[in-house]
């Protein structure tokens, strides 16, 4: 893997990362299960400790 500079990153044309382990591009979507499982675990713990109101407005 190669680390890109800010200038190099600004020239990258690609897909979208949704922040939950899912990323999509023109060819389709993929899941980084390591990230997804960690996020699911964190969300489950937060919802258990807040009675299901973690991060929700209203």
From Swiss-Prot:
Which GO biological process categories is it annotated with? Answer: defense response to bacterium; killing of cells of another organism
PROSITE patterns for this protein = BACTERIOCIN_IIA
Write out the GO cellular component annotations: extracellular region
Q: Which Cys pairs does UniProt list as disulfide-bonded? A: 24-29
UniProt keyword Disulfide bond, yes or no: yes
Which stretches are tagged as propeptide in the UniProt entry? 1-15
Pfam families for the chain: Bacteriocin_II
Q: Which residues cross the membrane?
A: none
Superkingdom, natural source = Bacteria
Name where it's found. Answer: Secreted
**Key words of the record:** Antibiotic, Antimicrobial, Bacteriocin, Disulfide bond, Secreted
- InterPro entries per record: Bacteriocin_IIa (IPR002633), Bacteriocin_IIa_CS (IPR023384), Bacteriocin_IIa_dom_sf (IPR023388)
Q: According to its UniProt record, which protein family does this protein belong to?
A: Belongs to the bacteriocin class IIA/YGNGV family.
Question: What functional role does this protein have?
Answer: Bacteriocin.
This chain's protein is named Enterocin-HF
Task: Give the species this sequence originates from.
Answer: Enterococcus faecium
């Amino acid at each position: 893997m190669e680390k890109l500079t800010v200038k190099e990153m600004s020239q990258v044309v690609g897909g979208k990362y949704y922040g939950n382990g899912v990323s999509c591009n023109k060819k389709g979507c993929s899941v980084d299960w390591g990230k997804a499982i960690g996020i699911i675990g964190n969300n489950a713990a937060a919802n258990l400790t807040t009675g299901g109101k973690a991060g929700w407005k209203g």
